[in-house]
């Protein structure tokens, strides 16, 4: 389909042009090659279509064009003689020609041909033949035909330029048909004519006057569901029939169009669309009124059809809003359809009847010309005006006649949904209806709020004194007050007290992180410092090395109650003196079952212990209760305060804040700015108010100079107001170093201020004098607080600070090396002893704790045959506290290993942000900084903050980077893990990728870039680049001086485009420094543990951050599996990574991103993941056990079911002898250019490599990759790598090779073939047939042989790729045909092993081609053929 795109102007303008027939008068027509309307040809080049669409450097083009292939283009021209110019390339030295033909009345007439000169397939050069092309006026079809030698040319586009116009032809009778075509030259004015210019007569045939709206030209889009975001513009269809569509359409997504209708009429409305979701519908709205809903389903994303959204709807002339909304007939939230165009057809065109239409569009028996209600619902009787009961409201009460139970309501009466008068009941005459009145006995005359409550009935501050007599209306919770509602004077000193007897629990605190019964130092009856009625303290931070105690009684009304906790450290809950809840894990929650208590009051004591000061709820609520004894836990603050009671003496908390001190009014700042980026905040920094600062968003700061402070230790407080909900915090620095920090809850609204203590930090001023204070907003929420003041209260003269972990003077920073020169080779990984190796049959839990996951009282994952765990997380905080580390070592690592499992400990980058704050205390100078000086926050992991600093990106260029990574090694190795794995994927080279980040322009990065450039270029070269003084050169300043912004860089950096100076150099430099610095860390590990396996989440296809290092011996990480695209067949995109890991001789262990299993949850397809597991092991990888999977959102975790996966993992262990020691076996190599991935938008490589891997896989041509690096690190394979293969395939990414790399490939001679020639080579495929039909796309046959034992059986893994409803269909009558010369020796017999535990000898025969044929049945998702030879 060739679609001329218009700019996205207001649709009403576009429609006016469409209706009036206005055409742009262009003299040049430019056509993209891939936009052909039709293609053909008979040459067998192994492709599914005669020509193929592909991409070259972001441009669409066509390839696989052979002699006899053609492409057709529909065009609309002014007519006349045209020059034609092709943008074409070929790698064939002689023979390729292009002939152009024009369809003239059904006959193709040649316009001439031209030879295509030799060059390169993807180097498109201008070619203008001497002949011209004659085009008729209006629409016509042009054909480009390949003539000459077999392999022809690739085409990017062609251009037709008018050189001689057609003489104009008149239209004397103005009927729209030119005189030279008009068979009725004197038609009366205004009549409707046919294509011959003759009047159409008789009948009520609508004239068919219509116009089309391209759906991507919408005015606005949105959704009624928070999970959806509205549509995007995309492309769907077959290569020869592409449609530009509204894409990513999910349930409730809508598109609006403002359309100027030229005349009042009845219109039919249809939508051209495709869709494979059988419950998808489309709803048509006219000016907000729903007109109709119809199913939209074609069975495929590529097959388009017209769907009638309305058979007839009356629309008055003028501008109207048309909305099309996606819905689901089952109410399911999912992807739905792809919309191309809307067609509006005027049904009331008079059809030559002389004027008045004779239609009745809504079939109600009243002609449209007399119909007052033109859209009467089908089947409803209408009156003489054409209106039905559902369209009338005789008493004008807003309820239509068909449902009005009181049809004669007096005008102005308030009615209910039945049209009957609403009777208003208000017993206390306060103006609030009784059903809505929360205070039914309001004193006469007293003003009330919307709930019907007056001041004498309210107590806003819960101090026991009603609002009408409360002289202190904002008393803090728990304060003892007098009769006027004001605080009683208890002296404010420790020891003063009052007696409490009533609602709530007594709250106290004792020293010690585990002050529990039976522990040393246990305090049975600690002092009570407060009374809490809501237990919100359970979700707050707990003071370091202390235990909070909540005591009193709890009321259980029916004898059923259960409790839950998710507190970061230790918990004990006692009911009637019995321990019912006990947990010391900082990461796992715990809960009770129904306690089945006797109804009534019960003694209650809750103790929460903390060792470090960061404690509180880990996620969700910290402490919860289900009053029905189930699992619907809610925080006590959401329950009635009357369920708790207590009595006892309450004393003043000894840590209550002291009064007075130094006050810093926040509006008196000397400087302000921001290190954050909140799009909705137009201000960079604090905005000064009369007595506060406002518009404070995350990262905003203010500086205050010349603040006089005495040396000593202080306590710090800040007075702020915040929105109703969120995560808030502040940090105070003194003279550039962190002093105090704290996080706090909402104050309840912007107009409610509260003072909070900034409890973290050293809080020490070392010298008396003037200082500069820096106050910064930190925390989870974008919008933070309005600030009044900071108060610093001195509490002692001590000015001693604790030493920091990181001392720069203790570390030597290596000089930055220059770029690699000359051709490079991939380094062979360090040899690891067999006892320590990652084995191909290893089965790993994703997390160690999965082995003990309890489901319905059972541990269903304990019998999976697991050998270890994938992600062993060290403690998230207090990482440098050896007590904490040794607790982890003994209670987690050693405990896991004692059960016979291997523990893989994980070093961190993104999740290590808190460790880095603890390591440096002041991490700010070490962060990545963008071109506009902002920190880069790792938002993909959430909006987190620790010790006063957010989860900002650490720069690899920082001098603290290597010491920090080595410190991780030191701490982790104290636990003696079996293996190490580093989540290197989130190193700061990634900040040069993805448009949300924007590169690293920190001072350390700029300093290192100077050194790198000086080592790559001579002074003369630097001057030619505009660098006159390299010693002072700052790349960021250089770019800003040229007007390049952060946005410019981000957009260009994503795909290395946009002509940004030195961009490629900067990306290569970042990778070089990353490789150098992390190599130092890896060598440090290897010196301490020579035989340990070291893994890293580094992949060839995220080439900006790939680590070329032999000390990494296995690969790991989270990867994309494409479940949101399809769960009807197994993905091939993951095979790119598995083949990449094979190419570098490193096993890949992985797990999918959270959204992948979430999609299986949404589609109720838990067994689809079986295919992911089978495919991983078949290709030599490891897929960790999906036990309790994190899916995010409101669901948090989901279990796809142990029973769905147990047999697969047990099968892996049972067939260890056919997995361990085996490697890929292929007769074909595939050339992969790493630079193609550098320009890709995601970590799965570019479109070309994905396409080629899919083609080879679905042809059952086993292959392995030959890796060619980029210009920054020009890796080439060794000759031994080439020698493994009989043939080597390349594709369109060949143009990314350097000249030197191309020469190495060319040296391999005739074995190098274009991937399109694969079908001409015998002996490469293992052909799989089902019921006699070749079905290579259905079952993949993956061949592997033993690395060292030539007598070991050959192995072919059979992967059944299709799924139906999330389940693999079982296949019978499967035949696997292996070419006689495929393996080194002939196959003599075969056994089939299946996950159901069965192993059987299967028939082996020989077909007419001499292939060995193995017969297989009962194949579900995976089978292993063991082949003797």
Swiss-Prot record:
SUPFAM superfamilies: Chitinase insertion domain (SSF54556), Galactose-binding domain-like (SSF49785), TSP type-3 repeat (SSF103647). The keyword Metal-binding applies. Optimum pH is 7.2. Active between pH 6.0 and 9.0. Residues 369-378 have a biased composition (Polar residues). InterPro entries: CBM6, Cellulose-bd_IV, Chitinase_insertion_sf, Galactose-bd-like_sf, PA14/GLEYA, Thrombospondin_3-like_rpt, TSP_type-3_rpt. Belongs to the glycosyl hydrolase 96 family. This is Alpha-agarase.
């Amino acid at each position: 389909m060739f679609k001329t795109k218009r700019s996205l102007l207001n649709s009403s303008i576009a429609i006016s042009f469409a209706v009036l027939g206005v055409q742009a008068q262009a003299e040049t027509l430019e056509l993209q090659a891939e936009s052909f309307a039709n293609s053909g040809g008979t040459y067998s080049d192994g492709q599914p279509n005669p020509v193929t669409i592909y991409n070259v450097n972001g441009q669409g083009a066509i390839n696989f064009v052979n002699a006899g292939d053609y492409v057709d283009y529909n065009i609309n021209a002014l007519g006349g003689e045209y020059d034609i110019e092709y943008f074409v390339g070929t790698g064939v030295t002689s023979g390729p020609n292009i002939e152009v033909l024009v369809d003239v009345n059904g006959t193709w007439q040649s316009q001439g041909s031209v030879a295509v000169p030799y060059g390169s397939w993807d180097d498109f050069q201008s070619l203008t033949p001497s002949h011209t092309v004659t085009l008729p006026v209006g629409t016509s079809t042009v054909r480009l035909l390949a003539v000459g030698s077999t392999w022809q040319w690739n085409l990017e586009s062609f251009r037709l330029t008018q050189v001689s116009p057609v003489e104009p032809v008149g239209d004397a009778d103005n009927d729209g048909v030119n005189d030279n075509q008009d068979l009725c030259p004197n038609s009366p004015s205004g009549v409707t004519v046919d294509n011959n210019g003759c009047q159409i007569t008789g009948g009520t045939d609508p004239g068919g006057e219509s116009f089309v709206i391209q759906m991507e030209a919408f005015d606005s889009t949105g959704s009624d569901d928070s999970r959806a975001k509205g549509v995007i513009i995309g492309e769907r269809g077959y290569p020869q029939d592409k449609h530009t569509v509204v894409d990513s359409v999910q349930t409730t997504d809508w598109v609006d169009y403002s359309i100027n209708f030229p005349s009042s009429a009845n219109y039919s409305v249809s939508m051209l669309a495709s869709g494979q979701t059988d419950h998808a519908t489309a709803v048509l709205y006219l000016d907000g009124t729903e007109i109709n809903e119809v199913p939209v389903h074609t069975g495929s994303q590529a097959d388009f059809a017209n769907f009638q959204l309305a058979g007839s709807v009356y629309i008055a002339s003028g501008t109207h809003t048309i909305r099309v909304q996606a819905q689901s007939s089952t109410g399911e939230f999912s992807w739905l359809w792809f919309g191309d165009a809307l067609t509006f057809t005027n049904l009331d065109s008079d059809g030559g009847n002389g004027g008045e239409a004779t239609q009745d569009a809504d079939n109600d028996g009243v002609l449209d010309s007399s119909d007052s209600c033109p859209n009467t619902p089908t089947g409803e009787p209408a009156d003489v005006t054409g209106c039905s009961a559902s369209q009338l409201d005789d008493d004008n009460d807003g309820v239509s006649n068909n449902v009005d139970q009181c049809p004669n309501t007096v005008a102005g009466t308030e009615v209910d949904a039945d049209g009957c008068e609403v009777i208003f009941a208000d017993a206390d005459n306060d103006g609030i209806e009784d059903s809505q009145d929360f205070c039914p006995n309001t004193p006469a005359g007293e003003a009330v709020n919307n709930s019907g409550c007056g001041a004498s009935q309210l107590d806003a501050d819960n101090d026991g004194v009603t609002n009408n007599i409360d002289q202190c209306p904002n008393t803090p919770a728990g304060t003892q007050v007098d009769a006027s509602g004001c605080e009683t004077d208890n002296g404010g000193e420790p020891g003063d007290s009052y007696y409490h007897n009533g609602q709530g629990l007594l709250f106290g605190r004792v020293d010690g992180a585990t002050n529990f019964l039976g522990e040393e130092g246990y305090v049975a009856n600690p002092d009570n410092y407060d009374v809490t009625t809501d237990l919100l303290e359970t979700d707050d931070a707990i003071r370091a090395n202390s235990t909070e105690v909540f005591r009193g009684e709890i009321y259980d009304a029916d004898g059923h109650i259960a409790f839950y906790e998710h507190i970061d450290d230790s918990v004990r809950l006692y009911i009637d003196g019995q321990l019912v809840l006990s947990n010391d894990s900082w990461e796992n929650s715990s809960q009770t079952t129904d306690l089945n208590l006797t109804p009534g009051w019960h003694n209650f004591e809750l103790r929460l212990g903390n060792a470090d000061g960061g404690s509180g709820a880990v996620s969700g609520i910290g402490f919860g209760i289900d009053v029905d004894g189930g699992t619907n836990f809610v925080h006590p603050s959401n329950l009635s305060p009357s369920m708790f009671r207590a009595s006892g003496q309450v004393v003043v908390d000894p840590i209550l804040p002291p009064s007075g001190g130094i006050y810093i009014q926040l509006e008196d700042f000397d400087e302000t700015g921001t290190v954050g980026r909140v799009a909705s905040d137009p201000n960079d920094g604090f905005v000064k108010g009369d007595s506060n600062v406002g518009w404070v968003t995350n990262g905003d700061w203010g500086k205050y100079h010349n603040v006089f402070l005495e040396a000593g230790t202080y306590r710090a407080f800040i007075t702020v107001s915040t929105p109703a909900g969120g995560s808030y915090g502040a940090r105070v620095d003194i003279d550039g170093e962190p002093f105090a920090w704290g996080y706090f809850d909402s104050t309840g609204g912007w107009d409610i201020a509260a003072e909070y203590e900034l409890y973290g930090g050293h809080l020490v001023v070392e010298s008396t004098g003037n200082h500069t204070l820096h106050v910064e907003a930190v925390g989870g929420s974008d919008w933070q607080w309005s600030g009044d003041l900071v108060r610093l209260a001195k509490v002692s003269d001590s000015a001693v600070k604790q030493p920091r972990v990181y001392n720069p003077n203790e570390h030597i920073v290596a000089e930055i090396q220059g770029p690699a020169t000359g051709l490079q080779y991939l380094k062979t990984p360090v040899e690891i002893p067999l006892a320590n190796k990652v084995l191909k049959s290893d089965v790993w839990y994703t997390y160690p704790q999965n082995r003990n996951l309890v489901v319905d009282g059972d541990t269903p994952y304990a019998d999976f045959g697991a050998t270890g765990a994938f992600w062993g997380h060290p403690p998230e905080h207090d990482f440098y506290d050896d007590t904490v580390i040794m607790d982890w070592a003994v209670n987690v690592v050693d405990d896991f290993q004692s059960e016979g499992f291997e523990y893989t400990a994980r070093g961190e980058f993104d999740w290590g942000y808190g460790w880095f704050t603890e390591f440096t205390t002041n991490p700010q100078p070490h962060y990545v900084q963008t071109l506009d000086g902002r920190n880069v926050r790792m938002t993909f992991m959430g909006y987190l903050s620790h010790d006063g600093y957010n989860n900002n990106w650490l720069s690899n260029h920082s001098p603290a980077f290597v010491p920090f990574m080595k410190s991780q090694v030191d701490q982790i190795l104290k636990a003696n893990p079996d293996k190490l794995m580093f989540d290197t994927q989130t190193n700061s080279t990634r900040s040069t990728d993805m448009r949300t980040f924007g590169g690293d322009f920190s001072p350390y990065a700029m300093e290192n870039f100077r050194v790198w450039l000086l080592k790559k270029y001579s002074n003369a070269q630097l001057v030619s680049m505009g660098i006159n003084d390299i010693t002072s050169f700052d790349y960021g300043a250089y770019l800003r001086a040229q007007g390049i912004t952060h946005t410019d860089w981000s957009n260009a950096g994503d795909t290395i485009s946009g002509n940004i100076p030195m961009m490629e150099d900067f990306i290569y430099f970042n990778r070089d420094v990353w490789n150098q610095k992390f190599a130092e860390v890896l060598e440090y590990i290897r010196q301490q543990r020579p035989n340990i396996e070291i893994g890293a989440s580094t992949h060839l296809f995220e080439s900006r951050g790939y680590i070329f290092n032999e000390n990494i011996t296995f690969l790991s990480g989270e990867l994309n599996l494409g479940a949101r695209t399809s769960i009807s067949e197994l993905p091939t995109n993951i095979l790119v990574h598995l083949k990449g890991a094979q190419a570098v001789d490193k096993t890949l262990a992985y797990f999918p991103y959270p959204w992948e299993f979430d999609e299986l949850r949404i589609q109720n397809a838990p067994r689809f993941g079986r295919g992911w597991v089978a495919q991983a092991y078949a290709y030599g990888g490891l897929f960790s056990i999906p036990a309790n999977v994190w899916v995010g959102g409101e669901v948090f975790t989901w279990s796809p079911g142990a029973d769905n996966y147990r047999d697969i993992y047990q099968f892996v262990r049972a067939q260890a002898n056919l997995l361990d020691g085996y490697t890929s076996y292929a007769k074909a190599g595939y050339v992969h250019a790493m630079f193609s991935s550098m320009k890709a938008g995601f970590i799965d490589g570019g479109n070309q490599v994905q396409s080629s891997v899919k083609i080879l896989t679905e042809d059952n041509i086993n292959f392995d990759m030959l890796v060619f690096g980029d210009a920054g690190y020009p890796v080439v394979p060794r000759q031994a790598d080439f020698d493994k293969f009989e043939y080597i395939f390349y594709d369109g990414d060949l143009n990314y090779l350097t000249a030197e790399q191309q020469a190495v490939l060319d040296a391999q001679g005739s074995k190098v073939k274009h991937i399109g020639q694969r079908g001409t080579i015998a002996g490469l495929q293992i052909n799989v047939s089902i019921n006699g039909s070749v079905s290579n796309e259905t079952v993949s046959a993956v061949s592997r042989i033993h690395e060292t034992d030539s007598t070991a059986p050959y192995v072919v893994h059979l992967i059944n790729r299709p799924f139906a409803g999330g389940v693999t269909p079982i296949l019978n009558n499967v035949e696997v045909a292996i070419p006689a010369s495929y393996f080194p020796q002939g196959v003599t017999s075969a056994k089939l092993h299946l996950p159901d535990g069965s192993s059987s000898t299967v028939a082996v025969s020989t077909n007419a081609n001499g292939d060995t044929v193995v017969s297989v049945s009962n194949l579900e998702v995976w089978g292993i053929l063991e082949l003797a030879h």
